[in-house]
């Protein structure tokens, strides 16, 4: 472990196009090999498709989707006397949002065919309607935490 001080957390600036911090975080999650403009185009195309299909504000739908996918608890491995327990722990809001964005991007990428914008739009709309793989992943995480509730006293 480093002997120096922990790196200071930089504030996330709002996205210039949508004036939204979550959108900016999503662009960073979508980005591959430093190609930020490509990631921004994918997100804006996805928002365009959402607006086309639903007729509602894509930013509102996006925020709802992220809220529906954000986990409240997770399990973490804790070693106690030779045994490893899955200990349920609360998720800080920042980490929860990061996990939600990661899941949305990963499950969008694993969807079949079409462009990334279409896949992302589909996953976001599913998540906003409490369906889709990202929401299922959150439910799975919560079930794991519930199943291991007996080890909650090992929290650290």
From Swiss-Prot:
- UniProt signal peptide: none
Q: Which keywords appear in this protein's UniProt record, sorted alphabetically? A: Ribonucleoprotein, Ribosomal protein, RNA-binding, rRNA-binding, tRNA-binding
Instruction: State any single GO MF term.
Output: rRNA binding
Q: Would you kindly state one Gene Ontology biological process term found in this protein's UniProt entry?
A: translation
Gene Ontology cellular component annotations, sorted alphabetically: small ribosomal subunit
Q: Which residues cross the membrane?
A: none
- A Pfam family this protein belongs to? Ribosomal_S7
InterPro entries in alphabetical order: Ribosomal_uS7, Ribosomal_uS7_bac/org-type, Ribosomal_uS7_CS, Ribosomal_uS7_dom, Ribosomal_uS7_dom_sf
What Gene3D superfamilies does the record point to? Ribosomal protein S7 domain
Could you tell me the superkingdom of the organism this chain comes from?
A: Bacteria
NCBIfam families registered for this protein in UniProt: rpsG_bact (TIGR01029)
PANTHER family, per the entry: RIBOSOMAL PROTEIN S7 (PTHR11205)
Q: How does it assemble?
A: Part of the 30S ribosomal subunit. Contacts proteins S9 and S11.
- Family the entry assigns: Belongs to the universal ribosomal protein uS7 family.
Q: What job does this protein perform?
A: One of the primary rRNA binding proteins, it binds directly to 16S rRNA where it nucleates assembly of the head domain of the 30S subunit. Is located at the subunit interface close to the decoding center, probably blocks exit of the E-site tRNA.
Q: What is this protein called?
A: Small ribosomal subunit protein uS7
- Which organism encodes this protein? Prochlorococcus marinus (strain NATL2A)
Task: Identify the taxonomic lineage of the organism of origin.
Answer: Bacteria, Bacillati, Cyanobacteriota, Cyanophyceae, Synechococcales
| Gene name in the database record | rpsG
């Amino acid at each position: 472990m480093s002997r120096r001080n922990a790196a200071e957390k930089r504030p996330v600036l709002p996205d210039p196009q949508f004036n939204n911090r979550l959108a900016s975080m999503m662009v960073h999650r979508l980005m591959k090999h430093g190609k930020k403009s490509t990631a921004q185009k994918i997100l804006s195309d996805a928002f365009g498709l959402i607006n086309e299909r639903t007729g509602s504000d894509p930013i509102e739908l996006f925020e709802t989707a992220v809220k529906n996918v954000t986990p409240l608890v997770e399990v973490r491995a804790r070693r106690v006397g030779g045994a490893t327990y899955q200990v349920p722990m609360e998720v800080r809001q920042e980490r929860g949002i990061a996990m939600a964005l990661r899941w949305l991007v990963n499950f969008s990428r694993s969807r079949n065919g079409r462009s990334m914008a279409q896949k992302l739009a589909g996953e976001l709309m599913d998540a906003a309607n409490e369906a889709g793989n990202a929401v299922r992943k959150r439910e799975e995480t919560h079930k794991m935490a519930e199943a291991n509730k007996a080890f909650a006293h090992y929290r650290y």
